[in-house]
Structures are given as C-alpha cells and as structure tokens.
C-alpha cells in the first residue's frame, strides 16, 4: 500500500494547519464509531482520515462545518419572536404594541432607602479570637 503524505491532500485543503485539524477531527469521528468511506487496510484512524480526504470520499467543507459545530459550546437557535400577549392586569382591555406611554410608579427617596435596607444583608460582626 502506498503511504499517504501531506502532498496527496494539500491540493484538496490548501492550508496544512487546516488539513491537520480536519484529519484529526475525522480520526476522532472514526474512533467514536463513524462509518468509514474507504477500506481500512490495517491503517490507524489518522491515516484513514487522510486517505479519505485525499480520495475525496469525504468533503473538507463538511468536515470543517462538523468541526466548528463540535467546538461550539452554545448552539444558536433561531426562535420565533413571541406574539403580543395581553397584560394580565388589563382586565380584557387590549393594549396596542404602538403605545409609547408607560405608567411609572413614583416613590420618594425615603421609601427607596427603606426598601433597599430590607434587601441588604446584615452586616457581619468581626469574630473575636479567644
């Protein structure tokens, strides 16, 4: 069997660094049970992945997308925007989305400070060594 070299794959993937990343990702996919597209011929997974790239049985663009997807921690999902929901306190009165008037409850500074005091944790007392 002929040895797979980087020169066999470099015309499929221009950048050698990208080639190494893609071949390593494909080798990990094979290790995790992904289906082979060529015969193994007693080769190890990195060699099989390079042979797959050289023989163009797997697309480098598809590998790149799968690699990016595997590295993402949070997958962005386009969720539909929520429809306009009527307010609970409106008692059946419909509220237009174009209303710009907003009712704001005013409070004095003293009321605000009293409210904040209730939210603040109690001060810690220093511990004394005995």
Curated annotation (Swiss-Prot):
The keyword Transferase applies. The keyword Transcription applies. Keywords: DNA-directed RNA polymerase, Nucleotidyltransferase, Transcription, Transferase. It is an enzyme of class 2 (transferase). Its EC number is 2.7.7.6. It catalyses: RNA(n) + a ribonucleoside 5'-triphosphate = RNA(n+1) + diphosphate. NCBIfam families: rpoZ. GO terms for cellular component: DNA-directed RNA polymerase complex. Pfam families: RNA_pol_Rpb6. GO terms for biological process: DNA-templated transcription. This is DNA-directed RNA polymerase subunit omega. One of its GO terms (molecular function) is DNA-directed RNA polymerase activity. Promotes RNA polymerase assembly. Latches the N- and C-terminal regions of the beta' subunit thereby facilitating its interaction with the beta and alpha subunits. The RNAP catalytic core consists of 2 alpha, 1 beta, 1 beta' and 1 omega subunit. When a sigma factor is associated with the core the holoenzyme is formed, which can initiate transcription. Belongs to the RNA polymerase subunit omega family. It comes from Rhodopseudomonas palustris (strain BisA53). Residues 109-130 are annotated as: Disordered. SMART domains: RNA_pol_Rpb6.
């Amino acid at each position: 069997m002929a040895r797979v070299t980087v020169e066999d794959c470099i015309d499929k993937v221009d950048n050698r660094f990208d080639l190494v990343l893609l071949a390593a990702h494909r080798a990990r996919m094979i290790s995790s049970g992904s289906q082979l597209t060529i015969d193994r011929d007693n080769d190890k997974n990195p060699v099989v992945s390079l042979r797959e790239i050289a023989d163009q049985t797997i697309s480098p663009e598809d590998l790149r997308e799968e690699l990016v997807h595997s590295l993402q921690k949070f997958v962005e999902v386009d969720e539909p925007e929520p429809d306009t929901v009527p307010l609970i306190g409106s008692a059946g009165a419909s509220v237009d989305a174009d209303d710009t008037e907003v009712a704001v409850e005013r409070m004095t500074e003293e009321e605000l400070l009293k409210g904040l005091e209730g939210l603040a944790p109690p001060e810690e007392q220093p511990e004394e060594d005995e």
